[in-house]
Amino acid sequence: MKIVEVKNLTYRINDFEILKNVTFSVEEGEFVGIIGPNGAGKTTLVRILVGDIKNYEGKVEVRGKIGYLPQLHQVQREFPITVKEFAAMGMYGRYRKIDWEKVRSTLKDVGILHKENDPIKNLSGGEFQRLSLARALLSDPDILVLDEPEAGVDEMGKASFYELLNRLRKEKNITVIMVSHDIGMVFKECSTIMCLNRTLHCHGPTETINPEDLKKIFTDFDIWIRGTRHYEIYHGRERD
């Protein structure tokens, strides 16, 4: 079932086209990685999907509830609030009374229950991303939308976060749409890749994406995907 459907999406600021005639769909259960150079319209697309931007042209249908993880720098982390209180914000608007057992269970799922009473400002980048994931999960989403979740997180933290994300999306049957600058990680983790450069440059299952198409807009593409199975396939080591 198509859980997201976008047709002929165009978005302008004054006369400048940020997105032009973008058409795609997302099937339920997919893990979609959105890549593209700086200024390609990736974050704009995410903001349209989550409803932050309304004045676009075209058709956007989202058939399910979205849980959203914005970029790390967009979240004010100096508020005097604890980890469990921040996570519980994902339940606001759904319950008159916070289900603290559910909050604690979700914090346990993402591996930070031991931090539940700590101020959020004391968390590392990786820990805060896990907390943001917990908050999004507490809204009981059908779709998780993530905007550069690896930003500000070290390599070990990235690998751990993606392992967690993949496990939870399978357990909870959640569709994931993720913007990332870490192209190697996208090719390793995502089932589907969408490359934006204001228009839709290419889109399809990860194994069908041709590196030659991406090299037109990513000069260091081979470096970014080196070590992934995709790199081995397209450099002749698995073609037989």
From Swiss-Prot:
Q: Which residues bind ATP?
A: 36-43
Tagged with keyword Nucleotide-binding: yes
Q: Which domain of life is it from?
A: Bacteria
PROSITE patterns noted in UniProt: ABC_TRANSPORTER_1, ABC_TRANSPORTER_2
Q: What does this protein do?
A: Part of an ATP-driven transport system TM_0123/TM_0124/TM_0125 for a metal. Probably responsible for energy coupling to the transport system.
Q: Which family does it belong to?
A: Belongs to the ABC transporter superfamily.
- Name-wise, this protein is Probable metal transport system ATP-binding protein TM_0124
